[in-house]
Each structure stands twice: as structure tokens, then as C-alpha cells.
């Protein structure tokens, strides 16, 4: 029996997901769905000129997955060094007494509001497009699928407010957002999901950020596996949530942790953004907008901090 590359079984019994429909060497995944025509469609959504900042402020006390840290150190010794320089003025370098301070960071990009690279999650020893870890992992990152290989994002954004649709302040840990939830919320606003869209989910869980960080980091609601597949079937480019990961935790099946982002990233190349700040946009009933996400091009990294902008 001859099997298609998309359905042939792998060693662990799952069906083969490579080569990607975007090409055997592709590293951009579903961001390929954002065409020039899509960008023009998104730009035409701007009517008011109002900008919503969807990122949280980064600092050392933000909630994070265990083992992940953010430390910022300030370097002020330039002041003393400058005063010893031959061209120093009375209080700094030169007759204008210029001084400066800088900071240094010890941190992972996998905390705070960030975009995951398609090298972040694997299924066994394979990534999106079937690349083997043994072939791509190097000392300072991966030679394929690093965050620097992903294009910057300018597209149509949709905010699906499931908390409002269900009539509460927030969903609870383990709550599963279903296809029916998404369709109901979309119907209430008169919008639909199109290829190349970025679909963001407001669960209300993000309201705990900074107010109860311990509770925020213990669990989360999120899109379920069926909804993730629905998003992939609709050819979305990107999806995100106001939670520390993506998908319900505890998971729908206790033996399949983080299976939702795994499905999106590994099988479909759909990019995920986590820890979004969506309270203000949801409160103001912002459901369709121009979304701009520019990420630092960190060579071979598994993610990057982002400050997404929703513009209406």
C-alpha cells in the first residue's frame, strides 16, 4: 500500500505531517498565508486611528513558567570611567559632561508577551516540516526555524471574546474553548475567519496578570484541540491568547500536555503568541483590526518578545 506523505505513520504511531504544503524547505509556516493582498485588506480596516497596545510590561516579577527567569541589571560605572578620561569635563566625558547608563539582561524570550518560533515545540524528535532535532540543534540555537526566519506580521486581526460570550468575567483553568464558542462569538459580531487572519482569544484570564500572579501561573483556560484544528482548517496565520501558554491547562487529556500548541506549531506551522494583554480591547468591543507584530530577529532563537498593536 502506498501512503501519502501527510498520512504515513511515524515511529510513534502518529501520522506524518511533512513535507509542508508550503514546501519541503519552508520555515515560515502559516505566515505564508499573509499575502500582499492580505496586508492591503488589513490596512483598510483602520478608521479611527486608535492604537491598542497588547503587550505586558517586562520585569523580574512577572509570572512565568517554572525555571524561566528575567533579570535586568543596570550598569552605571561609565560615570566614573568617563571622569577619568583625558577629555573629561568636571562631571563626565567632554566639556559637555555627557554620561550614560545601560542595562544588561539575563532572560529567556519564552516569558512575557512573546511569539513562539516554529522550533519551540516538537513531536518526538521532529519539528514543523519534519526537521530532525539532531540535524538542526546547535550550541546557540537551531540552524532552521529560528525566530529570525519568521516574517514580521501585518494582517487582519480578530478578537474573539469568549469571556463575554459566556457571560462571565473570566473562564477557569481547564475550561475548553470549543468551535461552537468561537462560532457563537463571531456570529454576535458579524465577522468570519479568513485565510491569513490572526485570531486572538480573550478569556479574561489575563486580568490576573499583576493582580494575582500565583493564580495566573497555575492553570489556564484556552482553545481546545478541535478548535485548534478548526483554525488550521481555516488557514489562519497566527493565533494567541491572554494566557501563559495556549490551550487549556489542565489539558483535555491528562496524558497529552500542551497538545494544542503542539498541533498548531508542529503539524500546521501556525504561529502562537502568548501572554497577550487583551482587557482594554475587549472592554471597548474591538473585534476586527489591523494587527502589527514586529519581533526582534534573534538568530536561531525559539521565540521573541513582542509588543503587538491592534489599530482600528
PLM regions with names:
Residues 1-312:
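Active-/binding-site microenvironments in catalytic and ligand-binding cores
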Amino acid at each position: 500500500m502506498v501512503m501519502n506523505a501527510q498520512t504515513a505513520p511515524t515511529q510513534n504511531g502518529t501520522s506524518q505531517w511533512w513535507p509542508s504544503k508550503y514546501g519541503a524547505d519552508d520555515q515560515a509556516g502559516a505566515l505564508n498565508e499573509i499575502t500582499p493582498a492580505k496586508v492591503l485588506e488589513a490596512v483598510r480596516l483602520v478608521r479611527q486611528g486608535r492604537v491598542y497596545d497588547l503587550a505586558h510590561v517586562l520585569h523580574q516579577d512577572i509570572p512565568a513558567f517554572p525555571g524561566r527567569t528575567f533579570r535586568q541589571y543596570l550598569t552605571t560605572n561609565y560615570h566614573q570611567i568617563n571622569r577619568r578620561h583625558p577629555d573629561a569635563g568636571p562631571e563626565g566625558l567632554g566639556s559637555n559632561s555627557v554620561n550614560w547608563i545601560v542595562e544588561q539582561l539575563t532572560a529567556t524570550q519564552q516569558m512575557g508577551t512573546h511569539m513562539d518560533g516554529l522550533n519551540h515545540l516538537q513531536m518526538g524528535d521532529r519539528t514543523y516540516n519534519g526537521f530532525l532535532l539532531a540535524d538542526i540543534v546547535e550550541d546557540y540555537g537551531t540552524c532552521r526555524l529560528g525566530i529570525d526566519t519568521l516574517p514580521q506580521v501585518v494582517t487582519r486581526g480578530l478578537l474573539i471574546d469568549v469571556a463575554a460570550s459566556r457571560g462571565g468575567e473570566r473562564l477557569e483553568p481547564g475550561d475548553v474553548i470549543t468551535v461552537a464558542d468561537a462560532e457563537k462569538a463571531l456570529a454576535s459580531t458579524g465577522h468570519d475567519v479568513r485565510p491569513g487572519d490572526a485570531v486572538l482569544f480573550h478569556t479574561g484570564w489575563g486580568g490576573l496578570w499583576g493582580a494575582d500572579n500565583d493564580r495566573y501561573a497555575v492553570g489556564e483556560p484556552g482553545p481546545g484541540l478541535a478548535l485548534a484544528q478548526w483554525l488550521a482548517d481555516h488557514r489562519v496565520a497566527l493565533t494567541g491568547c491572554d494566557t501563559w501558554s495556549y490551550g487549556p491547562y489542565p489539558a483535555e487529556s491528562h496524558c497529552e500536555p500542551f497538545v494544542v500548541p503542539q498541533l498548531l506549531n508542529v503539524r500546521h506551522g501556525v504561529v502562537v503568541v502568548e501572554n497577550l494583554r487583551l482587557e482594554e480591547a475587549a472592554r471597548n468591543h474591538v473585534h476586527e483590526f489591523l494587527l502589527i507584530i514586529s519581533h526582534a530577529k534573534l538568530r536561531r532563537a525559539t521565540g521573541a518578545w513582542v509588543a503587538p498593536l491592534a489599530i482600528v
